Swiss-Prot record:
Disulfide bonds: none annotated. It comes from Treponema pallidum (strain Nichols). GO terms for molecular function: mRNA binding; structural constituent of ribosome. This is Large ribosomal subunit protein bL12. Homodimer. Part of the ribosomal stalk of the 50S ribosomal subunit. Forms a multimeric L10(L12)X complex, where L10 forms an elongated spine to which 2 to 4 L12 dimers bind in a sequential fashion. Binds GTP-bound translation factors. The gene is rplL. One of its GO terms (cellular component) is cytosolic large ribosomal subunit. The keyword Ribonucleoprotein applies.
Amino acid sequence: MAALSNEQIIEAIRGKTILELSELIKAVEEEFGVTAAVPVAPVAEGGGAGSVAAEEQTEFTVVLKGLAEPGKKIAVIKEVRNVISGLGLKEAKDLVEGAPKTLKENVSKEEAAKIKESMTAAGALIEIS
């Protein structure tokens, strides 16, 4: 098999949906025994009187935990498509049926709250972490 250039790989990735990219990342992690998680530096303990309290979290992950009511599945699928632009109907349906699934990562507190509000109104169970 001929080696692919970086440009060919990027072009192949560009054509994928967010759900397909998520599955690709998981497959790469499993294949090579690595993780895409960012290592966290240990927090220094102690500190003087001027030390700042624990830093406030600035990036959040919005996770679809499931449906609040089984009859709201269609409304939740529609709202998932609003939240994740470019997501097809089948991908949105698979995401909802495969809950718990991450909807958005590294979003601001305001955006996470907005997503939770719209998804909850549609009938979804949402967790922000």
